[in-house]
UniProtKB/Swiss-Prot annotation:
Residues 130-142 have a biased composition (Basic and acidic residues). It comes from Chlamydia trachomatis serovar D (strain ATCC VR-885 / DSM 19411 / UW-3/Cx). Residues 121-142 are annotated as: Disordered. This is Uncharacterized protein CT_273. Belongs to the chlamydial CPn_0422/CT_273/TC_0545 family. It comes from the Bacteria.
Length: 188
């Protein structure tokens, strides 16, 4: 940073000559400083070029440089920033249902039919179902003594399927509901 006293003398000379020119101009047209300010208010020029918003500047969404160690997928920069799904890489809701059924059937085979899971994310009012399912599963684990490996598989499978079902799938349903309500509001 350059401080004021570190400037060369030519800067001071230029400043004084510029001030002298401005003062001479004011004397020629016989205007005071307040009148010049009033003229400047009327001579404003509007800048019509679009500027990035503060949010896009802060989040740096306008930058196209690759900062990762891999290149982005094709048309990555052209796609929309938000998607209607919480985790779009898991696929559509139908594909998520198929994957959950595959996991459930695989765990059922491994535990010799002792594993069972039923989806609860089909409706928007699922709080009562969730609490009753948790009570039933807790009683189920207490009543039956499973082998250690089967018990671990059942618990991990239940946790995984609950995360997919109640976390991601139900969130996707709520996002779809909100988006549909927004479209209804915009259209009508």
């Amino acid at each position: 940073m350059v401080e004021i006293f570190n400037y060369s003398t030519s800067v001071y000379e230029k400043h004084s000559s510029t001030n002298k020119l401005v003062n001479d101009f004011r004397k020629e047209i016989q205007m005071e400083g307040a009148a010049i300010r009033d003229i400047a208010k009327h001579a404003q020029i509007l800048d019509m070029t679009p500027k990035p918003s503060a949010l896009s500047t802060l989040m740096q969404t306008n930058k196209k440089t690759c900062w990762a160690s891999f290149s982005p997928p094709t048309n990555f920069h052209k796609q929309r920033f938000s998607t209607p799904y919480l985790v779009p890489s898991l696929g559509s809701p139908d594909k998520q249902d198929q994957d959950m059924e595959k996991i459930s059937s695989y765990l059922k085979v491994l535990t010799r039919g002792k594993f069972s899971y039923r989806s609860t994310a089909d409706t928007l009012s699922r709080k009562n179902k969730r609490s009753s399912d948790q009570k039933r599963n807790g009683q189920h684990f207490e009543q039956e003594e499973l082998e250690v490996e089967e018990e671990v598989l059942v618990r991990e499978g239940t946790v995984l399927l609950r995360a997919l079902d109640q976390g991601i799938k139900s969130s996707n349903l709520l996002i779809d509901y909100v988006i549909s309500r927004i479209f209804q509001f915009v259209q009508g």
